[in-house]
């Protein structure tokens, strides 16, 4: 009986994030359209030193599920090259992953994001993300604000 309860508890820890988030939003290493919600805790839109582009790093916290997200917005009319070789998630100041979002082209007027894997963390954990963006060959690092899980 105790064994069955432990197995059920373990299974629920794996299933709950899928129910709460509708599945994981892991799209790395590819860029995709994004719609931010109140679960996104993001840096300011940082002007990139090239061509009407802003970059932003976010940590998404939804109860005990979390992930790092990097966002690039092209406010100009010309396409730009972009990549994010480092999308890092930190738990209480310790890095838990460093993902690579592949090189791509972003057309003028578009915004794209790269979602790193979703992780389950306890409510006591404080999360933040770092993103390293390379746009048109210029690199910049941007840090998200910290966010406590379950808030």
Predicted region positions:
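Secretory targeting and sorting signals
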Residues: 1-27
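Post-signal peptide N-terminal regions of Sec-secreted extracellular proteins
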Residues: 26-151
């Amino acid at each position: 009986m105790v064994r069955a309860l432990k197995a059920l508890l373990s299974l629920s820890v794996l299933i709950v994030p899928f129910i709460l988030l509708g599945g994981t939003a892991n799209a790395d290493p590819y860029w995709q359209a994004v719609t931010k919600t109140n679960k996104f805790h993001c840096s300011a839109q940082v002007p990139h030193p090239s061509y009407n582009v802003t970059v932003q790093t976010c940590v998404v916290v939804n109860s005990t599920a979390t992930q790092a997200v990097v966002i690039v917005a092209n406010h100009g009319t010309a396409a730009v090259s972009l990549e994010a070789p480092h999308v890092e998630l930190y738990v209480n100041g310790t890095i838990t992953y460093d993902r690579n979002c592949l090189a791509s082209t972003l057309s003028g007027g578009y915004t794209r994001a790269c979602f790193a894997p979703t992780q389950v963390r306890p409510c006591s954990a404080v999360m933040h993300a770092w993103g390293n963006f390379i746009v048109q060959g210029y690199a910049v690092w941007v840090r998200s604000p910290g966010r406590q899980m379950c808030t």
